[in-house]
A protein has these predicted regions:
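A broadly conserved sequence feature marking short terminus-proximal activation segments
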Residues: 171-231, 236-238, 370-385
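Long, charge-rich boundary regions
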Residues: 258-338
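Phosphoinositide-binding peripheral membrane targeting modules
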Residues: 309-361, 372-379
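Short, acidic/hydrophobic/Gly-rich beta-strand patch recurrent on exposed beta strands
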Residues: 363-367
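Soluble catalytic domains of membrane acyltransferases
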Residues: 3, 8-9, 13, 17, ...
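Cys/His-rich short segments
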Residues: 217-272
Length: 398
């Protein structure tokens, strides 16, 4: 068989491992609870929960095996270090879309005695709670036909949240254990495997913090969180929340909340409406939007903004035009000017039940191999797009 995926280059990966080990030990204070891969020989698959962008650093440091990571194609195309990523044996793929060539590459890793790592959720959490895990993990694990291990991380969200402008030093833990042998997997149904994966990879960082009670340096800083918690729970107005240091404040009604170094919120004055766990605030906003969508016939969401696409030679996103982006219960519509030419594209949400996004900045829509990055005029609306898509996708799958 002609190799499509290289085993990680031993020299490049050794340097990569050393860097990860130093960061995990001294910067992230990684604590490994157990590592059942220590005595494992031969190929295997690792499935991991995804709390933050630093998760791969801690996993690499803890597991002394050359790992082939499945990573976002957007990340691969725009980081500017393709040659190094190739040397590390990564498999780039479109998020939430798995092509036959992707499957062949993943299969090839384990057939060549390698270690394949997958993040089934595909996205980092924006609120400390695990994102939706697509129901395709069971089929993939059955296809790979190898022992499967879980790498379960806690604390990386509180260390480096997706929305945060600052890093917070505290504690990250990692638990690596055998989920099922290939023989056990062959005896399980796809539905049983899907349920098992969801059960073992689900997390709630704020519930965990109630027991762990770990302080994080700068852990009370909420700047950037207003791009996720964008609606005031007191006056229920959107995009009015501001954040400075450890304090949220509504610019409309004056409602305030203060964060502590554990990541919990408290009221500042009598009459403030505050959720101790930020994810509960997120859920409150989500339910309000869900009710609005349910009660509004033919609900649509529209925004005007700039459109970017990946420039291959430059290995980065570049602006190509301006569009109006519209979302309804079935599809996205992109309508405007691209490269000074009329542009219209319709993308079914069945192809994109979830979107890569940067809170307060942008979201990405995938159409086959093409990635479109949309930057709305008001970045605060990005999270509303994400919530609306979740609601529509949930209705479609119900």
């Amino acid at each position: 068989m002609k190799k499509r995926v290289k085993r990680p280059n031993i020299f490049v990966y050794s340097l990569f491992f050393l860097i990860c080990k130093v960061l995990a030990t001294f910067k992230f204070k990684l604590k490994v609870i157990r590592n059942e891969l220590k005595k494992k020989k031969g190929p295997c698959v690792i499935i991991a929960n995804h709390e933050a962008s630093i998760d791969f650093i801690n996993l690499t440091a803890a597991v002394k095996r050359r790992i082939n990571y499945v990573i976002s194609n957007s990340f691969y195309q725009t980081l500017g270090i393709k040659s190094l990523l190739n040397a590390c044996g990564v498999i780039p793929k479109q998020q939430f879309q798995t092509a036959i060539t992707d499957l062949k590459k993943m299969k090839e890793v384990v057939q060549n005695n390698g270690t394949l790592t997958i993040y089934p959720a595909g996205l980092m959490t924006e609120n400390g709670v695990s994102t939706i895990i697509p129901g395709s993990s069971g089929k993939l694990l059955k296809f790979l036909k190898e022992d499967v291990y879980v790498a379960y991380t806690t604390g990386s969200y509180l260390t480096h949240p997706k929305w945060s402008k600052v890093y917070r030093k505290g504690r990250i833990t990692l638990d690596v254990y055998l989920l099922a042998t290939k023989e056990e997997i062959s005896q399980m149904s796809v539905e049983e495997l899907d349920a098992l994966v969801i059960d073992r990879l689900s997390f709630n960082e704020y519930e965990n913090q109630e027991t762990a009670q770990i302080e994080y340096k700068n852990g009370d800083n909420v700047e950037g969180f207003e791009n996720v918690l964008h609606l005031c729970p007191k006056c229920q107005k959107e995009f009015v929340m501001t954040a400075s240091g450890n304090t949220f404040k509504c610019s409309s009604c004056g409602n305030q909340a203060r964060s502590n170094k554990f990541g919990f919120l408290t009221n500042i004055k009598d009459g403030d409406i505050v959720f101790k766990h930020p994810n509960k605030w997120y859920d409150y906003i989500y339910e309000l939007l869900k009710n609005e969508i349910t009660q509004t016939e033919n609900y649509t969401l529209s925004s005007h903004g700039k459109l970017q696409m990946i420039e291959g030679k430059k290995q980065k996103f570049v602006e190509v035009g301006e569009i109006d982006l519209t979302l309804n219960s079935k599809e996205f519509t992109l309508n405007g000017q691209v490269h000074n030419q009329p542009f219209n594209l319709v993308v079914s949400i069945a192809k994109s039940p979830m979107l890569p996004f940067s809170p307060g900045k942008s979201l990405e829509i995938q159409d086959g191999p093409t990635i479109y990055r949309f930057i709305p005029e008001d970045g605060k609306i990005v999270i509303k797009w994400i919530m609306a898509l979740k609601i529509f996708a949930a209705k479609q799958s119900a």
